[in-house]
UniProtKB/Swiss-Prot annotation:
Keywords: Amidation, Disulfide bond, Hormone, Secreted
Predominant location: secreted
GO cellular component, one term: extracellular region
Family: Belongs to the vasopressin/oxytocin family.
Protein name: Valitocin
Cysteines engaged in disulfide bonds, as pairs: 1-6
InterPro entries attached to this UniProt entry: Neurohypophysial_hormone_CS (IPR022423)
Length: 9
């Protein structure tokens, strides 16, 4: 993911 609030990287 490109966002910090992503449950799984």
């Amino acid at each position: 993911c490109y966002i910090q609030n992503c449950p799984v990287g």
